Amino acid sequence: MDSGGKLKFYRILTSVILGAFIIYSNLYWVQPLITLFSKSFNQSPASASLVLSITTIALALGLLFAPFLSNNLGRKNTMVYSLLLTSLFNMMSMVIDHFYWLLLMRFLIGICISGFLASVITYLIEEVKKEWLGRVVGIYVAGTALGGVLARTISSLLVEHYELSTVAVIIGGATLIASNLFWIMLPQSSNFIKRTYALIHLKNGFMASLLDNKIRGIYIAHFFTIGIYTSVLNYISYPLTKPPYSFNQSVIGLFYFATLSGVVGSLLFGRLIGKFFDISLYRISLLIMAVGAVLTTSHILWFVITGLIIFAFGIFASNTMASNWIANNAPSTHKTEANSLYSIFYYLGSSIIGWLSGYLFLFFGWSIFIFLLSGLLVLTAFLLRGKKHELELEDHSYQKNENST
């Protein structure tokens, strides 16, 4: 790689880390404050969790059309507009003290985020050499972990000194400045070719990706995986505010530093993919998550912290594996749609399971809630299987028919 190529590579690398930080800061700063939103707006835990779930629902809906926008505006322009609008809407999210106004702004934030997510992996596929792609995607996913954990921690610390509305303005303002830096640093696409694109092409791309045995199983599995991750982080603040812990909000925010282990998980699995690109890595990451989740049911504080560390390591390792699997196995003419469909399943799982699981938590309590989620992770790992470079959910009826012939 010559000096010009190195400079471009590092500009891309720095920019996507910054973009990940911006997106996931605006997305997740509300998560550790769900208990406060519940009190401020007189909402149940499940209803208060809509401040996150409504955003991820909108994100999933936006991803249905974001590839069309990405193709027409170009990768960089789509990402820049997405980041700027996301930050502005976040600053406006609590200018009116009403729960439904907040939900409206969070919905619009989700729509804007979809533009970035529909473009970033495709941009990397187009602009980064294949031998470096796995590592760069791993670093990008690590950036998402960093953005999420810093946003959760900073918002928890800020809310001890400022109103929720002020916290929204501070985070939105900081990411607005960062969005302009992203605009300046990210190189223009040099390998992007604008296609003649109609909505029928979008539909065909989604269907081709959904029917592809190599990637369909990942879509389904990650729907549940990210939903479980969101559920644990949505509601863990409730048991931490009660005996034997009785922590205040700023202390609870520090627990989210444990999820920085996701950076290690992303980087480690990003390297492993280059040497051992097999779906068994994904199954291992799900089992790691299950072990970590179970540890959070302990009344021993260090077990809870260790559990969160292991749990976050597992989810970000699985994200890296899944993102690379889609990038390498998606239909060659439908890369953008395949990545968008992955994100749709990802965020639908986050919103639907993250919201509905709140009722399980209310009904069963923390320990049984966690054992149910961990059991689902183990079941998913068991049902997934790899056959050469194919990936599919285990179909017992199909196997039975095969054995009888």
What are the language-model segments listed below?
Residues 2-6, 187-219:
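Juxtamembrane intracellular "pre-TM" segments in multi-pass secondary transporters
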Residues 42, 74, 95-101, 112, ...:
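Helix-breaking motifs and short loop linkers at transmembrane-helix boundaries and internal kinks
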Residues 61-97:
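Conserved MFS/SLC helix-loop-helix module at the cytosolic interface between two early adjacent transmembrane helices
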Residues 63-74, 265-277, 361:
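Helix-to-loop junctions at the C-terminal end of transmembrane segments
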Residues 85, 89, 100-108, 302-310:
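Paired small-residue
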Residues 101, 130-132, 139-187:
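Helix-loop-helix hairpin linking two adjacent transmembrane segments in secondary transporters
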Residues 105-143:
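Cytoplasmic helix-loop-helix junction between adjacent transmembrane helices
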Residues 329-366:
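A late C-terminal transmembrane helix in Major Facilitator Superfamily
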